């Protein structure tokens, strides 16, 4: 072998690693105008989002302070809403109770069914059924609220008589399910309608979470002799726990703020009823929608004050969800 071949076969001598200054210069040189524009747009979008949130909170807080400062009752605990007298007396106790009760009913009904549907689609349903069922669920998620409200008022409410009669006959002694034979435009009807509305939302998110379960986890459980249900219980559900919580909080957010469907179905009555079957009650969103157009300037400030409370509740719910997900992340294996 000649000398030229030997020189070609020799490895190049090692070079010293670049210094910190050289790395910074290289980074600046590699940043092209398009990268700088994209970085600026991305950063500006994030700042704009925070600015919009701050502007909404500031507007609500300012208008709410104008009303609360003149309220002659306790805004948080009063059971009346009368902004047309001097001094005005109004409070949100009835609205908070109705909003929480209807949302809890919706979550209790929707979450187990949604998780069951998601598990069926990802682990039990035949391939030929998955696509049609998934399409129907996606379609239900896209139905406008007013359509749900009209369906609830014209179809669901008339069908509640039988259910309410059965509950009153067998569970009326509890007081919660007693019925005075009035129109079934009650909190239970609203909760059932809200459950139907949030069901596709929770189902879609849970389905996508369950699809992300590593195949090796399920195969390992099957190799140990686990049944299909044991695989779901020991591998799928622990992995998707945080995702299901996120899906539930997303559905809860819609239930808390739902307006038109509730206003169409519920018979408004600014009072708290022990029974879930008797008509009456109210929610934050329903009260704002039904009174805002006819309210005076001060009355609108009072309604905005109730909207501020709903805004804070929504933030607290999402914050609690993030905290729960963060605590369970190490056990579930899913990304928060």
What are these regions (language model features)?
Residues 23-41, 60-106, 126-127, 180, ...:
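Periplasmic/extracellular loop-to-transmembrane helix junction in inner-membrane transport proteins
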Residues 136-139, 143, 202-209, 213, ...:
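Transmembrane alpha-helices
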Residues 70-93, 148-196, 276-278:
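Membrane-interfacial helix termini and adjacent extracytoplasmic/periplasmic loops
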Residues 252-297:
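Glycine-rich helix-loop "coupling/hinge" segments at transmembrane-helix boundaries
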Residues 207-211, 215, 222, 290-336:
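C-terminal transmembrane helix and the adjacent membrane-cytosol boundary/short C-terminal tail
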Residues 106-137, 321-330:
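Transmembrane-helix boundary motif in ABC transporter permease subunits
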Residues 1-46, 321-336:
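Transmembrane alpha-helical segments of polytopic membrane transport and secretion proteins
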Residues 97, 101-109, 113, 117, ...:
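Hydrophobic alpha-helical transmembrane segments of multipass integral membrane proteins
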């Amino acid at each position: 072998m000649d000398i030229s071949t030997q020189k070609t076969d020799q490895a190049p001598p090692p070079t010293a690693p670049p210094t910190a200054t050289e790395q910074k210069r290289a980074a600046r040189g590699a940043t092209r105008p398009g990268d700088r524009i994209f970085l600026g747009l991305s950063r500006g979008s994030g700042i704009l989002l925070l600015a919009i949130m701050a502007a909404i909170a500031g507007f609500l807080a300012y208008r709410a302070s104008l009303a609360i400062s003149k309220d002659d009752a306790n805004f948080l605990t009063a059971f009346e809403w009368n902004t047309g007298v001097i001094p005005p007396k109004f409070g949100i106790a009835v609205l908070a109770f109705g909003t929480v009760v209807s949302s809890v009913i919706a979550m209790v009904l929707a979450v187990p069914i949604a998780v069951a549907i998601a598990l069926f689609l990802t682990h039990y349903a035949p391939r030929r059924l998955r696509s049609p069922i998934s399409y129907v669920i996606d379609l239900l998620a896209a139905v406008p609220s007013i359509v749900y409200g009209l369906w609830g008022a014209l179809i669901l409410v008339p069908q509640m008589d039988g259910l309410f009669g059965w509950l009153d006959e067998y569970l009326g002694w509890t007081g919660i399910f007693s019925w005075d034979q009035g129109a079934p435009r009650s909190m239970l009807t609203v909760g059932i309608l809200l459950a139907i509305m949030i069901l596709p939302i929770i189902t879609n998110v849970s389905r996508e979470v369950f699809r992300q379960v590593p195949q090796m986890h399920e195969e390992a459980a099957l190799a140990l002799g686990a049944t299909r249900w044991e695989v779901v219980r020991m591998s799928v559900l622990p992995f998707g726990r945080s995702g299901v919580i996120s899906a539930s909080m997303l559905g809860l957010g819609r239930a808390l703020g739902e307006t038109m469907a509730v206003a169409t179905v519920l018979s408004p009555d600014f009072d708290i009823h022990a029974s879930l079957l008797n008509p009456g009650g109210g929610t934050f969103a329903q009260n704002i929608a039904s009174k805002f157009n006819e309210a005076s300037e001060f009355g609108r400030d009072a309604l905005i004050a109730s909207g501020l409370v709903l805004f804070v509740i929504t933030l607290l719910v999402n914050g609690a969800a993030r905290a729960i997900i963060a605590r369970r992340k190490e056990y579930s294996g899913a990304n928060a």
